[in-house]
Amino acid sequence: MNKGAFITLEGPEGSGKTTIVKMIEKYLSENNIEYISTREPGGINISEQIRDVILNKDNVAMDARTEALLYVASRRQHLAERVIPAIKEGKVVICDRFIDSSLAYQGYARGIGIDEVMAINEFAIDGYMPDLTLYLDIEPEVGLKRISKNNEREVNRLDLEALDFHKKVREGYFKLLEKYPNRIKKINANQPVDKVFEEVKGFLK
């Protein structure tokens, strides 16, 4: 694995990203690879404050473009303050969600347009695209059922969207798999977690 590699994890709600991130952290530590692990939206104080606004269950009136722009603002601050410095120090960056979430959720599922959401993100990311994106694929029904059984996970505004929205999110990710086949790698997240991680490890070497 190259020094300063930027690796992101993507997937619908309940796909198991957080669990896999922890397993990647353990794997990197065992192999003496310097890394930071972070998430979007959030990862730093300013971005976490924006996250609270985005995911607040009371903000049901939020316009789709407002939502997209808030994600972009959070992303820029997170990149500038945490991700870019780590990459420049030669550390591997593991990020739970990044630009592809905006493209799938706001671009496709919200109907703004993948290219349109990409355009507003290009200003924010300033060329910092992931080197590798691991997409954990799961049927929305299964993912949402997992969330409902997980007492430790706080339910947010996006979790409360109708099933049709979550199906569109998955369709959006499939569009991105077609658009970026060299960067985005699809992993079957319906398997037991140890088998999911075996697939993940194959892309980390």
UniProtKB/Swiss-Prot annotation:
Enzyme class comes to: transferase
**Catalysis performed (reactions):** dTMP + ATP = dTDP + ADP
* Stored CDD domains: TMPK (cd01672)
Tell me the residue numbers annotated for binding ATP. Answer: G11, P12, E13, G14, S15, G16, K17, T18
Q: Which InterPro entries match?
A: P-loop_NTPase, Thymidylate_kin-like_dom, Thymidylate_kin_CS, Thymidylate_kinase
Name the EC number(s): 2.7.4.9
Q: Which GO terms describe its biological process?
A: dTDP biosynthetic process; dTTP biosynthetic process; dUDP biosynthetic process
Q: What does this protein do?
A: Phosphorylation of dTMP to form dTDP in both de novo and salvage pathways of dTTP synthesis.
Its name, as the record gives it, is Thymidylate kinase
Species per Swiss-Prot/TrEMBL record = Clostridium novyi (strain NT)
